[in-house]
Amino acid sequence: MFLNTIQPAVGATHAGRRVGRGIGSGLGKTGGRGHKGQKSRSGGFHKVGFEGGQMPLQRRLPKRGFKSLTVSANAQLRLSELESIAVNEIDILVLKQAGLIASTVSNVKVIASGEISKAVALKGIKVTKGARAAIEDVGGKIEM
């Protein structure tokens, strides 16, 4: 079997619509377009969002906010999430492999939410004051 020989199963597809081939076909003369009007003409379709000259909805509503380019590059991590990692030396690569942060993230900050009971060594990861105190209390280290 090759990609260029694959075909749909028999009866799975409909025959193409043959328009303008006589009265008996059911789609003769006007070809299913009705009589007159913009939609009956060739090339007679307006652009998406066009409301016949009325000010379109997307222009009536005010512009609002913007899409931050940095939001996908930054991530927060709880102390309790560090507990679930089996490795003791933790850096950004380890967090990505554990699935705790997205692959697009380049900056991580550990926040003091939850509890930690095992000593971990953080490398290249920022921490808040509360998180730093909690990590160092259980014998952990933080390197930048």
From Swiss-Prot:
PROSITE patterns assigned: RIBOSOMAL_L15
A cellular component term, taken from the record's GO annotations: cytosolic large ribosomal subunit
InterPro entries given in the database record: Ribosomal_uL15 (IPR030878), Ribosomal_uL15/eL18 (IPR021131), Ribosomal_uL15/eL18_sf (IPR036227), Ribosomal_uL15_bac-type (IPR005749), Ribosomal_uL15_CS (IPR001196)
Keywords linked to the UniProt accession: Ribonucleoprotein, Ribosomal protein, RNA-binding, rRNA-binding
GO molecular function, one term: rRNA binding
GO BP: any one term: translation
Keyword Ribonucleoprotein appears in the UniProt entry: yes
Pfam families reported for this sequence: Ribosomal_L27A (PF00828)
Region (Disordered): 20-49
Biased composition (Gly residues): 21-31
Cysteine pairs bridged by disulfides in the record: none
Entry similarity comment: Belongs to the universal ribosomal protein uL15 family.
Function: Binds to the 23S rRNA.
Subunit structure: Part of the 50S ribosomal subunit.
Protein name: Large ribosomal subunit protein uL15
Organism: Neisseria gonorrhoeae (strain ATCC 700825 / FA 1090)
